[in-house]
């Protein structure tokens, strides 16, 4: 943001940083999930057990994430009180930042199979897709919209990583994720 929005860049950066501090609640949930799930899923399960548990875990992760998303988004005016008054103008980007944080957990869940199968070189492909999306959308959106563009660029980056992880999963390690139910959780949260 600092170099892409020359006029008022530090103010833009401050607003974006303040709003991401509110969204840290979602990242704390993600970290707790990661610290519990990674050792669990990387232990020695039969493939059929691993696939079933991984599919169920993603569904429940998204369900819990959507509850946290709703709790923060619906009470964003209360959460806005923890940041300075001059930073509150950017509170409208909070749902976008929260959405990006949810997607971080989704692609983590989609990555367990290649960690388990010791194909971690695929992580380079996934993060490379995220990097390309962040750079492309960042250079396009940030000069136009400032911190709003930065939030959308991050969401695009996380979406790209989820998309590539999903594609790799479908191709090399098909897992029966309940995408219909997961989509329902997301749709209900977005409607509310």
Regions found by a protein language model. Give the residues of each.
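Membrane-interface helix-loop junctions in multi-pass transport and translocation proteins
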Residues: 6-12, 121, 128-163
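Membrane-interface junctions at transmembrane-helix termini in multi-pass inner-membrane proteins
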Residues: 42-46, 98-129, 169-171
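Transmembrane alpha-helical segments of multi-pass transport proteins
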Residues: 95, 129-133, 179-192
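Hydrophobic transmembrane alpha-helices of multi-pass small-molecule transporters
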Residues: 24-28, 69, 105-108, 131-138, ...
């Amino acid at each position: 943001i600092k170099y892409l929005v020359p006029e008022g860049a530090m103010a833009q950066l401050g607003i974006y940083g303040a709003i991401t501090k509110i969204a840290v609640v979602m990242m704390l949930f993600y970290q707790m999930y990661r610290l519990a799930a990674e050792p669990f899923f990387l232990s020695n399960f039969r493939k059929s057990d691993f696939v079933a548990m991984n599919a169920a875990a993603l569904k429940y992760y998204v369900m819990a994430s959507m509850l946290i998303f709703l709790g923060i988004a619906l009470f964003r005016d209360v959460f806005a009180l923890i940041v300075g008054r001059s930073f509150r103008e950017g509170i409208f980007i909070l749902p976008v930042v929260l959405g990006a944080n949810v997607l971080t957990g989704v692609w983590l869940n989609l990555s367990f199979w290649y960690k388990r199968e010791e194909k971690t070189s695929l992580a380079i492909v996934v993060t490379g897709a995220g990097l390309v999306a962040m750079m492309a959308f960042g250079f396009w959106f940030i000069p136009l919209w400032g911190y709003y563009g930065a939030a959308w660029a991050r969401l695009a980056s996380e979406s790209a990583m989820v998309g590539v992880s999903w594609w790799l999963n479908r191709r090399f390690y098909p897992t029966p994720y309940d995408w219909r139910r997961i989509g329902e959780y997301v749709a209900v949260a977005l409607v509310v």
